[in-house]
Amino acid sequence: MGKIIGIDLGTTNSCVAVMDGDSAKVIENSEGTRTTPSIIAFSDGEVLVGQPAKRQAVTNPKNTLYAIKRLIGRRFDEKEVQKDINLVPYNIVKSDNGDAWVEIDGKKMAPPEISARILQKMKKTVEDYLGETITEAVITVPAYFNDSQRQATKDAGRIAGLEVKRIINEPTAAALAYGIDRGAKDAKIAVYDLGGGTFDISIIETIDLDEEGQQFEVLATNGDTFLGGEDFDRRIIDYLVNEFKKEQGIDLTSDSLALQRLKEAAEKAKIELSSSQQTDINLPYITADASGPKHMNLKLTRAKLESLVADLIERSLEPCRIAMKDAGLSNSDITDVILVGGQTRMPKVQEAVKNFFGKEPRKDVNPDEAVAMGAAIQGGVLGGQVKDVLLLDVTPLSLGIETLGGVMTKLIEKNTTIPTKASQIFSTAEDNQSAVTIHILQGERQQASANKSLGRFDLSDIPPAPRGMPQIEVSFDIDANGILNVSAKDKQTGKEQSIIIKASSGLSDEEVARMVKDAEAHAEEDRKFQERIETKNSAESMINGVEKAISELGDEVTSDEKEKTEAAIKALREVMKGEDSDAIKEKTNALMEAASSIMQKAYAKMTEKQQSDDGAGTQNADHKEDDVVDADFEEVKSDKKD
């Protein structure tokens, strides 16, 4: 059985890990870094992923996609999506089914399709490291992701050519990595996870089961799927735009090139202010008007940054209060506080967490890597490499159906341990009602319309009867990934109807299949591209070697040999201008044949020279041997005292 890798599919950065013996190991990507920017760019027919995409973002803002995780599994009309439309340089559009998609060069693409590109890079990173094909993964999601977002993440995995063995909550994964690393011990851990685009808080209990191993049980979880480092960056960008407008009278908000440079500068300034009190923001030629080019030169202090984002930090504390209340714990019950996500490196965030929980957060957990490591450990559990670990996660939001009067009736309460099942008997609202519509909801509001609609289906052919008489059993079944299956059964007739919730905003099987084919086609394109490069490099090396041999041999090369070889080189250089690998290989072989006599002469000359050098070296060694003088020696002791 192959290894099951662990992937932290982040809003800003992604990370991949795999079990290496008894521990999880984060794998470096092809650029040599342990995290990969979750950025995809489309440039001149080429798809760039990670650092290469980030590097060209300033010059190609409309075709560079970042923070796509904030759109995954979301409807176009959601207020969070509408807010993002005005903040990003790329086009967010409404798909035929009402989803939020993106548009690049007139082509609409689904967020899972974009995220799949990042997952493919993570997959290839491990494949290059292990030297084997990877087909299975555990992928993490924010604990507060709803059913649609989880399903869309699973779709992204399928498109990337991965069987997603488990969807695991990010804070749970971090606690798993932390708990396994420090050994079995009873503890109650608060995981504060403030990433690039989402925020989660989970309260997790670890229990030492002696010979049976270690149990990780999530007691409560809460969060905000539209709060993260991107929002902190946006506050800095808005501040810079306003300051520049005051100074120069120019509004930069409609200049996508300037905004991309501001985004880059804001992120850099934010990082610098975690370790220094002040930073300079210098952006020459940020724009121009009739009077000439304009430059931005501003100082940003840590205090100013803290004032700009104070409400965002405060916003993260309300879910903490709710989670603690749901877990039935007080601050004194918490053993350890773990910080996860790059934004937790900000000193003001650390201070807020410390003040809230009344204890210093632990600094021995890498906030960028813990989630991927936990996912790899869960992969190890599922693959049988990691023994004696029991993980009990929860559903983050309540699940139920719409009943008479537009009310949501809950069947499964939030923070229920999964997998789980629940059933309830309902009846008809009118006399002789022959069908009922089961409308499935997720959320905490009493009013059905205020919650997230996950889907609906009909149970028909109910025998005529007075209202309230038929007995319809509705059953909810949540699997270990937090994905829901709902069924409704008429107790009298035994007729049953069921639905696996793929969410009204999910992709159809046909769409996923098409995207899988597209991804495979791109993988084949990438392979051919790599093959072309290697073939061209090999041809170039061959040309260099032959030209060097001709130069070194001089008059030893006959005019006929030289003429034949130069003609072969010219023919090879001509085909190297194209993209036909087979033609390049053919002309490379032709050059090898044409230059064979020259290369034989060059080899013979080199062998002769080596033998000559070896002979001279032996002679010198003999002379040195004659010069050796035998001598006695005695140790001279110093009178110096230490």
UniProtKB/Swiss-Prot annotation:
Q: Which organism is it from?
A: Dichelobacter nodosus (strain VCS1703A)
Give the protein's function. Answer: Acts as a chaperone.
Q: Please identify the protein, giving its name as recorded.
A: Chaperone protein DnaK
UniProt keyword Cytoplasm present: no
One Gene Ontology MF term: ATP-dependent protein folding chaperone
Q: Name one Pfam family in it.
A: HSP70
Record key words, sorted = ATP-binding, Chaperone, Nucleotide-binding, Phosphoprotein, Stress response
Q: Which InterPro entries match?
A: ATPase_NBD, Chaperone_DnaK, Heat_shock_70_CS, HSP70_C_sf, HSP70_peptide-bd_sf, Hsp_70_fam
Q: Where is this region: Disordered?
A: 602-642
The lineage's top-level taxon is Bacteria
Give the induction text. Answer: By stress conditions e.g. heat shock.
What family is it from?
Belongs to the heat shock protein 70 family.
Q: Which residues carry this modification: Phosphothreonine?
A: 198
